[in-house]
Each structure stands twice: as structure tokens, then as C-alpha cells.
């Protein structure tokens, strides 16, 4: 577009003058027609032939990949562990276990996360309140005869086992000495396809794991893992506006009267109200209305 610069002053027309052309610079690359590979370039086979020959004679099988051996060991250990669990699972049958033979699974409860120094007599004191107990068995190691931290209790009445499970349960727990123990039903003979934790199953984590470990440090320290020690006190009653905590300057009656109880006349039934009509507008029409009108170029 050509502009008539004669109508502008000299200081303004000087701003619209074209710039000088770019200076010529010699290209750094060769032209496309003259490009070619250096004919003096040769391979490295002659240089490495002697070195490679000595290396292959010294290491005929190559050096071991030690950084990959660790991954292979972990992979093999997982495969062996899975095969071992499969063999143990095939031999596991709770219905033929001599320790629980001739017992009703619906009258039996499972107690986990027990203290390791707890015996049957002390355990009976915590569950005798639910009903008469027929049998208590704390599972122990066959070699060391030490407790494994869980036990089974058989009641004489199935209602007693249901009451113990509903009152204590898995989430609430019961405190025995310095540990929070859980109570569950016997799932080995009542739940199909159930596997114990030692065979790759189970329903939860360890007792020493923190329940609030996913929280940040300052929140996890304030919370407690014992549900019985948590504070479930009701909230304080809502304060009235007349209390000393609320100043009269902010929530006083004068502000409310001036804002919500002014001297505006109330609408009565006889007062005519304007009819509200809604006109539909498409999206394109609303866009055109919101856009400003184009400015016309001045004609000097």
C-alpha cells in the first residue's frame, strides 16, 4: 500500500521511509551442485583389527552384565516364591485341620494383632462378657512355641460370636495391653476362595503400620490410632449475635435496618408489575452484539 507522504511533515514522513537493503554475506556452505563426500575418509577397521583381535582372545565370552543381574535375581525369586505359595495352597485344607476339627465355624471368631506375651487365660477375660466360651486357641510356632499374634475363640452360642464381631469388629478394635486387636469371623471355612495371609491372601496390613501414614507429619502426629482415645465430643452451640465475641459495629441492628429494613415501599397485590419477557438469542447473535463495531479509517 502506497501512502502519500507529502502531506505529512518532514519529521513524520521520515518515519515511513523504507530501510536500506540487507548487505550481502557470503554463504558458509557449498552450493548444492558442488556438495560431495570427502574421498579421503576411510573406515576404522584397519585401526581396530589388531585391538579387537586381542580383546576377543582375552574375553571370548564377553563381560557379565552385573547391572542387569540384580533384576534377574529379583525376577527369579518372585517366580520361586509364587511356585512355593501354589504348592502350599494346594496342600492347605482347613476342613481337615486337627486343631479345629469338630468345631462350628459360625461359632468361631478370629482375633488378630495380639500381644505376643498373652496367654489363653488373659484372653478369656476380654471375651467372656459376650457369652460362654467353649475353646480358646492361640496359634504358636511349631518349633519355638512362641505366639504368632492371633487366636481363635469358639463360643457355645453363635449369637455370642456375632455380638463380639459386631461390637468390636475390624475397624473399631479392642485394646489388650498396649495393642489394638481386631476381631473377625473365621473366613477359612465360611468364605469361598479365601486364602490366609501366609499363602498370599488376607484382608489387611500389619498391626504396627500407622493408619494415618498417608497424612502429613503434623496431622499424623495429632491423630491417634486408637479409636477409643479419639475425641468424639459434640460441637459447641452456635454463638448468638448478642455475645461479646461479635461487636455491635459489624453486626449491629443499625446496619441490618439500613440494609434490609429501609423505607422502601412494599409491593402490594394491587401494584402492577411489569411482565418479564424472555427473548431467545443464538450464540452467534450474542457474539456479534458483544463485539465492538469496526472503526472507520479517517479520510484526510
UniProtKB/Swiss-Prot annotation:
Residues 204-248, 263-300 are annotated as: Disordered. Its main location: nucleus. GO terms for cellular component: commitment complex; nucleus; spliceosomal complex; U1 snRNP; U2-type prespliceosome. Residues 265-279 have a biased composition (Low complexity). Residues 107-198 form the RRM domain. InterPro entries: Nucleotide-bd_a/b_plait_sf, RBD_domain_sf, RRM_dom, U1_U11-U12_snRNP_70-35kDa, U1snRNP70_N. It is found in: Nucleus. Keywords: mRNA processing, mRNA splicing, Nucleus, Ribonucleoprotein, RNA-binding, Spliceosome. GO terms for molecular function: mRNA binding; U1 snRNA binding. Present with 736 molecules/cell in log phase SD medium. Involved in nuclear mRNA splicing. Component of the spliceosome, where it is associated with snRNP U1. Binds stem loop I of U1 snRNA. Interacts with mRNA. This is U1 small nuclear ribonucleoprotein 70 kDa homolog. It comes from Saccharomyces cerevisiae (strain ATCC 204508 / S288c) (Baker's yeast).
Amino acid at each position: 500500500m502506497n501512502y502519500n507522504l507529502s502531506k505529512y511533515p518532514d519529521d513524520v514522513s521520515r518515519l515511513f521511509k523504507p530501510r536500506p537493503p540487507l548487505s550481502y554475506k557470503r554463504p558458509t556452505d557449498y552450493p548444492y551442485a558442488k556438495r560431495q563426500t570427502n574421498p579421503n575418509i576411510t573406515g576404522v577397521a584397519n585401526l581396530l583389527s589388531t585391538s579387537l583381535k586381542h580383546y576377543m582372545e582375552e574375553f571370548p565370552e564377553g563381560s557379565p552384565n552385573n547391572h542387569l543381574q540384580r533384576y534377574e535375581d529379583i525376577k527369579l525369586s518372585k517366580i520361586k516364591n509364587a511356585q512355593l505359595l501354589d504348592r502350599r495352597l494346594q496342600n492347605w485344607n482347613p476342613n481337615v485341620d486337627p486343631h479345629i476339627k469338630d468345631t462350628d465355624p459360625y461359632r468361631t471368631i478370629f482375633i488378630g494383632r495380639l500381644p505376643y506375651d498373652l496367654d489363653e487365660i488373659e484372653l478369656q477375660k476380654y471375651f467372656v462378657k459376650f457369652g460362654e466360651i467353649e475353646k480358646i486357641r492361640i496359634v504358636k510356632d511349631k518349633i519355638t512355641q512362641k505366639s504368632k499374634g492371633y487366636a481363635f475363640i469358639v463360643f457355645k452360642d453363635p449369637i455370642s460370636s456375632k455380638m463380639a464381631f459386631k461390637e468390636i469388629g475390624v475397624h473399631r478394635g479392642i485394646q489388650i495391653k498396649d495393642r489394638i486387636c481386631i476381631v473377625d469371623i473365621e473366613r477359612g471355612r465360611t468364605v469361598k476362595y479365601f486364602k490366609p495371609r501366609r499363602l498370599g491372601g488376607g484382608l489387611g496390613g500389619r498391626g504396627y503400620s500407622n493408619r494415618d501414614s498417608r497424612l502429613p507429619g503434623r496431622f499424623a502426629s495429632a491423630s491417634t490410632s486408637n479409636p477409643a482415645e479419639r475425641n468424639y465430643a459434640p460441637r459447641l452451640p452456635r454463638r448468638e449475635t448478642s455475645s461479646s465475641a461479635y461487636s455491635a459495629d459489624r453486626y449491629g441492628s443499625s446496619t441490618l435496618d439500613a440494609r434490609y429494613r429501609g423505607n422502601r415501599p412494599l409491593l402490594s397485590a394491587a401494584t402492577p408489575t411489569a411482565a418479564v419477557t424472555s427473548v431467545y438469542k443464538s450464540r452467534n447473535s450474542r457474539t456479534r452484539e458483544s463485539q465492538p463495531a469496526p472503526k472507520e479509517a479517517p479520510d484526510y
